[in-house]
Regions:
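Short, glycine-/Ser/Thr-/acidic-enriched flexible segments
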Residues: 84, 109-111, 148-150, 164, ...
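Short, ligand-facing micro-motifs at secondary-structure edges
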Residues: 110-121, 144-171, 188-192, 201-206
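Glycine- and charge-enriched low-complexity intrinsically disordered segments
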Residues: 180-198
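A short glycine-rich beta-alpha junction/loop motif
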Residues: 1-16, 166-176, 203-234
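Sequence-specific dsDNA recognition surfaces
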Residues: 80-95, 107-144, 148-151
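Short coil/turn segments at secondary-structure boundaries
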Residues: 57-61, 92-99, 118-119, 204-207
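Non-catalytic DNA-recognition/assembly elements of restriction-modification systems
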Residues: 7-53, 57-90, 222, 226, ...
């Protein structure tokens, strides 16, 4: 059997205090994750109630539309007809580098506050400075653009902001950024709208057609959506925006706590940092 050496404090009391410190950090991270899940679930429930089931509007008249039967007076538009920016980024020919500006790829678009820092890749600062597209400014809708097995495409979405996952980062060529002229509230509305069964099925079908599974700009811009000037859409955005802001702040705090935990552990175990009673 091989011999391994571990730096473990001999004092049992010190071991317990170290475990207590690390456990408190883990508990706070878990609490933030639960809060974020609850906040998104709350927003999702309101969205479904208003824009899928139309519960608050069932006593009124409904009319036919490109989205099916909807409350009378509601406007529907194609994304192509709503002022927006839909773009992707790119990477240099040589690929990623070890240090520089973070480059966000499809593997990072996994829902809200689910960025995997262990998979972060970078582009050099000089290349980033020349890019005319793909910079993440905050609260744009990130769309998983392409990738996966032939004939099989599962779309996913995310919204970054408030310095999460980074203060400065760019997209690569496998992610779309959709922004309705800086309308954060409508971008958030679109996040939930794209997650509805109807739109997910549409993306599934469109993405599976290509040799390399994925969607293009036309696929996105052809989508019909409730117009941003609908009163109910505006009210939902005003409700959901503070929730998303808090979720992003919690995610940033979790990143700080994770780094603190990972930095403290070896220093506590080695005795470099003394554990006070």
């Amino acid at each position: 059997m091989r011999e391994y050496k571990f730096n473990i404090p001999c004092n049992i009391s010190d071991q317990h205090r170290i475990a207590s410190i690390l456990s408190s950090l883990d508990r706070k991270i878990e609490l933030n994750n639960k809060i974020n899940a609850d906040l998104e679930e709350m927003a999702q429930a309101i969205f479904k109630n208003w824009f899928v089931d139309f519960e608050p509007f069932k006593d009124g008249k409904f009319v036919d539309s490109e989205l099916g039967m909807i409350p009378e007076g509601w406007k529907v538009s194609q994304i192509a007809d709503i002022p927006h920016i839909l773009e992707t980024g790119k990477r240099p020919k040589g690929g990623a580098v070890e240090k520089g500006i973070p480059s966000v790829g499809a593997e990072h678009v996994k829902g809200m506050c689910a960025y995997d820092y262990s998979k972060t890749k970078y582009i050099n600062c000089e290349f980033a400075a020349k890019l005319k597209t793909g910079k993440i400014n905050g609260y744009e809708l990130m769309i998983y653009k392409d990738g996966g097995k032939p004939g099989y495409f599962i779309p996913n979405f995310s919204i970054f902001g408030e310095g999460y996952p980074f203060e400065n980062c760019y997209l690569n060529e496998h992610v779309f950024k959709l922004d309705f002229d800086g309308n954060k509230e409508f971008n958030i509305f679109c996040y939930f709208f794209f997650k509805t069964e109807k739109i997910m099925s549409y993306f599934n079908a469109q993405g599976a057609k290509a040799a390399i599974p994925g969607i293009n700009k036309k696929d996105v811009e052809n989508i019909y959506i409730f117009s941003p000037d609908n009163e109910s859409v505006i009210k939902f955005g005003e409700f959901a925006y503070p929730l998303f802001k808090q979720m992003l702040k919690n995610a940033i705090e979790n990143r700080t706590l994770s780094l603190l935990r990972d930095t403290l552990l070896p220093r506590l175990m080695s005795g470099e940092i003394e554990v006070l009673e």
